């Protein structure tokens, strides 16, 4: 039984066969002063329907669960009158328990009109030894839709509005025993529940709830609930409720199309009192045949907590995902920025999007969709008190573009990550591949647009490959784009910021069939006079890691290609200030393999810190750039080639880069081990001011080494070639404009080449192999990372 004045459900037998035998079937004649414009028949349990005064009906409830079928009163044309007109009141009352439940089935009129409630609904417990208090769970079902008018008020223990039917037994099981409530709509129904502006819904007992379930849900009124809300758009829906937490699954999506969920009112309630008093707002929709969207505006969330350490409540918005308590797609809102939503549990492939704008959220918020999740400050500005988690498989974005502000007091996660499936019972191998989307934070377009984040930030478009674990087949991983950009706007972050677009091979060992992995784009940039102020550390990562191929059984390569990690001020200028260290990485590590040919390639990308126009990058700590390429180990042949990428900081047409501590740039190439060592080729690493000023407070180090791999497997193999690349610490200038590079400590640039170790002798017929050749960077040779530049060392 759902206890509205307790935080834990009681599992006691309620309305059994003996109680059913006492059920009353009362169908009073329509009276002129009757409040409800319908004739009611009690079809389950025991209750009595009376008109106690003019326009006031009272339903006295004698059993824990009651079901009443209502036949609407019609006009001469077959149209239903308002079920509860303005000024009329329906009172549901029990003198035996505050935990009674009443399901009101409003049957269709001749013309199938929407059922309209404009009056007042009250449910209460009349304690003979105490005052009357709100209590009871009241449900209204109408298959043709429900309209809650602007004059309607509800003062209840708990409330459900639905266009989906249920059985008497299922309703009793939910109400009395905390079981599953199975709700089923007519196939293809698009019936809507609309709650108009001005409508007031109040449920004050602790552990209350308010549920709205239909093909189309439009919540435009106000609901203040001392517990949890659930707004669900679907055709078949399962609900269970315990300790303030809903489990919500939608086996069949809504037949409605377009915007099927709108919360554009005041949705909230008092704060949780602490452990066991869970306050949640849920909104779910599942698509069926046609694309759908969900819109959230105005006010969401609960009152501030009265004591430190208490979470006042949480908000979960979900498109094409079921929800279990606080968990969606394998991740929990309570885990904040560390949550991982990688269970591949989307319930539909049909597009379902979420849009949040012009809103105030007074609790932590998670919005997750199978496709696009977008949050914008809108023309009115927006705010979140708590953490903000935005997850969209194709796109997740957070922005302010209308000259208004967007503030978040806690941490922010913006994720378009993708996870390949790992399974031994696959129907389609495509699902083991991962292709991430686009994740972004953006402020700009209109001057005055701003974003202020009080905690840490993670913007992620990583791709995590899956695998067929029966046949040991690896999936591919293609990272997306992750960015934090201020363009004519202002972004302030009080904590650390991580921008990640990595390509990660499967972690399943002993892979036999490898696949390619690629890093994407990680961008932290200002342009058009935009500004970014980051108090903590910055981490940009577009690394790529190949899968772990078997070294004992035959296995194919998993080539890895690093992406682009960019810290930059772009056209139109701007400024970036980082209070801690800055780290950018676009390294690549080829996967292991066992084949007679070459091993996996490790081809690094670009890790750069540039100003392309007049502007400023100021880093209080150190700056580290890494674009190392490591070839994969190959037990059956030649080790993989390792290709260093570009790790550089540059000024092109002016501007200033200040680094308070040390500067380190690495673009090394490391050949993989094999029966013959793989070759390693250095890339391009360093710092250069063509025009402008670079100041490094500590030491500066640039390395573009080429290191050959060793002949580790078998006997007598030769080591791999090691060829150095291009390393530089330079200031050029022109006849008209100056350039300076100032280093406060040691300055080192290295483009060494070191051959790999030869294989060992078997002590008998096979002699030890020779070491690989090593060549330092040579100016006569174009660099493999960018043939427009020759190799060598330049200071």
Q: Residues of each region from the PLM?
A:
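Extracellular and secretory-pathway beta-repeat/beta-biased strand scaffolds
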Residues: 2-795
């Amino acid at each position: 039984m759902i206890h509205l004045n307790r935080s834990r459900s009681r599992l006691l037998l309620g309305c059994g066969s003996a109680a059913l035998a006492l059920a009353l079937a009362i169908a009073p004649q329509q009276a002129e002063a009757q409040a409800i414009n319908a004739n009611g028949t009690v079809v389950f349990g025991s209750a009595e329907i009376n008109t106690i005064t003019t326009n006031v009906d009272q339903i006295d409830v004698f059993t824990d669960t009651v079901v009443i079928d209502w036949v609407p009163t019609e006009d001469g044309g077959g149209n239903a009158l308002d079920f509860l007109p303005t000024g009329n009141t329906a009172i549901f009352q029990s003198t035996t328990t505050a935990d009674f439940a009443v399901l009101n089935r409003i049957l269709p009129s001749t013309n199938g009109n929407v059922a309209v409630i404009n009056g007042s609904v009250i449910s209460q417990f009349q304690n003979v030894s105490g005052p009357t208090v709100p209590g009871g769970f009241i449900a209204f079902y109408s298959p043709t839709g429900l309209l809650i008018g602007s004059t309607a008020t509800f003062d209840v223990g708990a409330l459900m509005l639905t266009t989906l039917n249920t059985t008497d037994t299922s309703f009793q099981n939910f109400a009395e025993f905390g079981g599953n409530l199975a709700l089923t709509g007519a196939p293809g129904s698009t019936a809507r529940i609309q709650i108009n502006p001005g409508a007031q819904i109040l449920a004050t007992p602790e552990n209350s709830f308010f549920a709205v379930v239909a093909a189309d849900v439009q919540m435009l009124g106000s609901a203040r609930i001392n517990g949890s809300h659930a707004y669900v758009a679907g055709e078949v829906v399962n609900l269970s409720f315990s300790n303030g937490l809903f489990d919500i699954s939608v086996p069949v999506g809504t037949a409605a199309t377009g915007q099927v969920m709108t919360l554009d009112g005041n949705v909230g309630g008092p704060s949780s009192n602490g452990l066991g008093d869970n306050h949640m707002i849920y909104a779910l929709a599942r698509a069926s045949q046609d694309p759908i969207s969900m819109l959230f505006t105005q006010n969401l969330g609960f009152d501030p907590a009265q004591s430190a350490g208490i979470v006042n409540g949480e908000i979960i918005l979900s498109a094409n995902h079921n929800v279990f308590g606080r968990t969606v797609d394998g991740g929990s809102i309570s885990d904040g920025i560390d949550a991982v939503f990688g269970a591949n549990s989307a319930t539909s492939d049909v597009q379902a999007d979420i849009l949040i704008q012009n809103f105030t959220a007074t609790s932590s918020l998670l919005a997750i969709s199978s496709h696009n999740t977008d949050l914008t400050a809108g023309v009115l500005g927006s705010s979140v008190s708590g953490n903000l988690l935005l997850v969209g498989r194709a796109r997740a974005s957070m922005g302010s573009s209308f000259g208004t502000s967007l503030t978040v007091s806690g941490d922010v996660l913006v994720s378009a990550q993708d996870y390949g499936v790992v399974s031994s019972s696959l129907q389609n191998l495509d699902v083991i591949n991962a292709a991430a989307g686009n994740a972004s934070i953006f402020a700009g377009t209109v001057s005055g647009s701003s974003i202020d984040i009080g905690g840490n930030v993670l913007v992620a478009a990583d791709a995590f490959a899956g695998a067929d674990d029966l046949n040991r087949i690896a999936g591919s991983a293609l990272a997306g784009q992750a960015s934090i950009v201020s363009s004519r706007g202002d972004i302030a972050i009080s904590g650390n910021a991580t921008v990640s677009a990595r390509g990660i091979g499967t972690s399943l060992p002993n892979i036999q069939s490898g696949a390619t992995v690629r890093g994407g784009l990680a961008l932290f940039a200002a342009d058009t006079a935009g500004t970014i102020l980051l108090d903590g550390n910055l981490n940009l990562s577009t690394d790529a890691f190949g899968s772990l191929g078997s070294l004992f059984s035959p296995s194919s390569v998993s080539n890895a290609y690093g992406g682009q990690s960019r810290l930059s001020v772009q056209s139109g200028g701007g400024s970036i200030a980082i209070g801690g260290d800055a780290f950018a990485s676009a390294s690549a590590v080829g996967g292991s393999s066992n084949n007679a040919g070459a091993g996996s390639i490790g081809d690094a990308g670009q890790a750069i810190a540039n100003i392309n126009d007049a502007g400023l990058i100021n880093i209080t700590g150190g700056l580290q750039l890494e674009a190392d390429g490591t070839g994969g180990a190959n037990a059956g042949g030649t080790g993989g080639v390792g290709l260093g990428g570009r790790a550089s900081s540059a000024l092109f047409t002016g501007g200033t880069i200040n680094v308070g501590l040390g500067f380190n740039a690495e673009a090394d190439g490391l050949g993989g081990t094999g029966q013959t060592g793989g070759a390693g080729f250095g890339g391009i690493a360093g710092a250069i001011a063509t025009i402008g000023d670079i100041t490094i407070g500590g030491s500066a180090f640039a390395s573009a080494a080429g290191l050959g791999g060793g002949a580790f497997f078998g006997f007598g193999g030769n080591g791999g070639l090691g060829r150095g690349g291009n390393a530089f610490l330079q200031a050029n200038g022109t006849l008209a404009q100056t350039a300076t590079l100032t280093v406060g400590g040691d300055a080192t640039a290295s483009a060494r080449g070191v051959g790999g170790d030869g294989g060992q002798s078997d002590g008998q017929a096979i002699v030890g192999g020779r070491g690989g050749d090593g060549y330092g960077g040579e100016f006569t040779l174009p660099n493999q990372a960018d043939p427009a530049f020759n190799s060598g060392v330049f200071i």
